[in-house]
């Protein structure tokens, strides 16, 4: 059973007209979760994409990023919602469909020039990933690549990231959503 078939689709959530791709059904399946981690790990080992650290976006990026840090032997740094980190932080505002939001990370999370794999569960508009990349660059890091379980290419995030010069990998896509 492939990864895509383990992802539940919930129509009209969080609002009418949205087809929500719920990865919790994939994560609760031990075989599915192992497939995700094994396939992303294999991709980075086989393709020689070099990075020093894995950074995960709150919250599901923590689940994937933490497991990848273990399998790839890299450290892990979280990017969190404001007010969740105890040390000095730097933040980045980004656009939502209706309004803005912020994410932050510790200002001393990376040494200058650290190459990073940015991880999140799903790529839609690209706003969260761009905010994460901006934070990494603010503290002196370099985004080596981005990894997602799901890409929704018709929403435009992949195109937006690639136009900004970022490369990415995703395990599966849902088109037309």
From Swiss-Prot:
InterPro entries for this protein: Ade_phspho_trans, PRibTrfase_dom, PRTase-like, UPRTase/APRTase
GO terms of biological process kind: adenine salvage; AMP salvage; purine ribonucleoside salvage
Enzyme Commission (EC) number: 2.4.2.7
Pfam (any one): Pribosyltran
Presence of the UniProt keyword Signal in the record: no
Family: Belongs to the purine/pyrimidine phosphoribosyltransferase family.
Stated name of the protein: Adenine phosphoribosyltransferase
């Amino acid at each position: 059973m492939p990864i895509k078939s383990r992802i539940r689709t919930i129509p009209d959530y969080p609002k009418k007209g949205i087809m929500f791709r719920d990865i919790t059904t994939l994560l609760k399946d031990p075989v599915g979760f192992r497939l995700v981690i094994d396939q992303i790990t294999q991709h980075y080992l086989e393709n020689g994409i070099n990075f020093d650290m894995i950074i995960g976006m709150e919250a599901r990026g923590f689940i994937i990023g933490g497991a990848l840090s273990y399998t790839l032997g890299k450290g892990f740094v979280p990017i969190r919602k404001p007010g969740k980190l105890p040390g000095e932080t730097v933040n980045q505002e980004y656009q939502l469909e209706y309004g803005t939001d912020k994410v932050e990370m510790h200002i001393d999370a990376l040494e200058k020039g650290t190459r990073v794999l940015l991880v999140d569960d799903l790529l839609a508009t690209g706003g969260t990933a761009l905010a994460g990349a901006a934070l990494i660059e603010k503290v002196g890091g370099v985004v080596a690549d981005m990894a997602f379980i799901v890409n929704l290419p018709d929403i435009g995030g992949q195109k937006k990231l690639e136009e900004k010069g970022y490369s990415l990998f995703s395990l599966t896509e849902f088109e037309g959503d």
